[in-house]
Amino acid sequence: MVDEATKRTLAAIPLLKTRAGPRDKDQWVGRLKEELVSLIKYVENNKKQDNDWFRLESNKEGTRWFGKCWYVHNLLKYEFDVEFDIPVTYPGTAPEIALPELDGKTAKMYRGGKICLTDHFKPLWARNVPKFGIAHAMALGLGPWLAVEIPDLVEKGIIVHKEKTSSE
Amino acid sequence: MANQTASLIEENQQLKAKIQELEDALAKKSAQHRVKITTMSSEVVDSNPYSRLMALKRMGIVKNYEDIRHYTVAIVGVGGVGSVTAEMLTRCGIGKLILFDYDKVELANMNRLFFRPDQSGMSKVEASEATLRDINPDVEFETHNYNITKVDKYDHFVGRIKSGGLQGKPVDLVLSCVDNFEARMAINMACNEINQMWIESGVSENAVSGHIQVVIPGQTSCFACAPPLVVADNIDEKTLKREGVCAASLPTTMGIVAGFLVQNTLKHLLQFGSVTHYLGYNAMKDYFPTMALKPNPHCDDSFCLIRQEEYQQYLAENPPEAESEDPTEDVVHESNEWGITLVDETPESEKKEELDPDLAKGLARAYDMPSVEQVRILVKDSTESQQETEEPVSLEELQSRLKGL
């Protein structure tokens, strides 16, 4: 269900401890700190392994997240805006990651550009509450989605490479 | 010149005739809107929209049909199931409907019931209200076009459940007609917190199975008590092709599930028949599993545990008189000169099922919750990372560090 490489990536992402959602005032601040530590570590790991593939930041409350993610296919870099809200039920349910500009371009999406996750993602998330956080959702959800969908969308000519986005 | 004037006059006349024609059509259409009816009548005449419903009283099915006007039902999700649910309750003459949805009508919805192509682009709640008001102006409507799982909308949602009913009372029943786990969990969380009964409904992504599940906080299993139940549809996952699609849907399955949902809503509100905790539908085999569901004493939802405690206390103070829920009266023998007694011959193995009910045939959990050890194999607990979180770093500093990467 989860390949070896993903397992190794996952194992290197710090786990979280606090079971608190955005409605849990003080505890949420603690959870948010854990999220940030975990995300920073994950991005650093990615950089070290020459596999840097996203940037995220949030509003002050940590309830709305946005940034960029990119995927390299045939030596060309395809970049997309990524965004999601932290639902009131978090971390009991995972965030629903969206790539709004791809909305309507692939059937593997729900309204608003929310990515369609595999059957394995939700059970895996449910079994790891509250240890999984945003970094895990990116690694297990968006990462594999991009790896499958972007090459396919490029082959079909649905997305084309934009020159400007290729410079880093 | 004269020619031109003549043709203009002719055009003018044609336009006037067209306007008259359209005005007549419009007048005819608005004349079709019926006026509000103050009391439900059981008179059997063509002009009475409630005659066939009130006939339920005459036939002895329902004692108090007109009471339906005192009830408020909140429907969360006005899609394939929710819109049909709303239409059924509107036609039944429900007192008030509160609709929640943040989606718009699209042509891709036209394989389902209720919405029309000309409503494309309208918000689902707005389009629903227009159609429903036309069908039955006696019903009161309240609509909210937002996502209930969002932090800034959730409190408003909970508030409307608590006081959106007629005369500011809590709503009588919440119906979940959403298409995702997150929204179901949000409804569950809200209803556990404010002790509100609700009914969950769902259709599988392959469109050939569905279910409804009654949640009475503390009494029956809540949505967080265990992984969701799924109706086994006898389709091998390996042969199910998911390439290029997220979900399929059929108007049939959705209509059937909406029918189940409203039937049980009516039975609960008007107190006739019995309401099953869980009713499944397997379209491939025409199989309908039913079962009772007990709450999980180790549920992750803290309010579920509070409600369970309250219910246990209630049971202790009000011990149930008879175990049988069946309203058929027991035959009482006034004398028993032969000392005849009934001996329970149920084997021990079968008795166990009642205490800890195994899943009904044809039902399964969406996934298992594995033991702690299994989780550890999947994700190694890295002790070094846990030490990092102990560092006294401010939230702002971490946020700027992430931003600065």
From Swiss-Prot, chain A:
<feature type="active site" description="Glycyl thioester intermediate">
    <location>
        <position position="116"/>
    </location>
</feature>
<dbReference type="GO" id="GO:0061709">
    <property type="term" value="P:reticulophagy"/>
</dbReference>
<dbReference type="InterPro" id="IPR016135">
    <property type="entry name" value="UBQ-conjugating_enzyme/RWD"/>
</dbReference>
<dbReference type="GO" id="GO:0034976">
    <property type="term" value="P:response to endoplasmic reticulum stress"/>
</dbReference>
<dbReference type="InterPro" id="IPR014806">
    <property type="entry name" value="Ufc1"/>
</dbReference>
<protein>
    <recommendedName>
        <fullName>Ubiquitin-fold modifier-conjugating enzyme 1</fullName>
    </recommendedName>
</protein>
<dbReference type="GO" id="GO:0071569">
    <property type="term" value="P:protein ufmylation"/>
</dbReference>
<keyword id="KW-0833">Ubl conjugation pathway</keyword>
<dbReference type="GO" id="GO:0071568">
    <property type="term" value="F:UFM1 transferase activity"/>
</dbReference>
<dbReference type="GO" id="GO:0061657">
    <property type="term" value="F:UFM1 conjugating enzyme activity"/>
</dbReference>
<comment type="similarity">
    <text>Belongs to the ubiquitin-conjugating enzyme family. UFC1 subfamily.</text>
</comment>
<comment type="function">
    <text>E2-like enzyme which forms an intermediate with UFM1 via a thioester linkage.</text>
</comment>
<dbReference type="Pfam" id="PF08694">
    <property type="entry name" value="UFC1"/>
</dbReference>
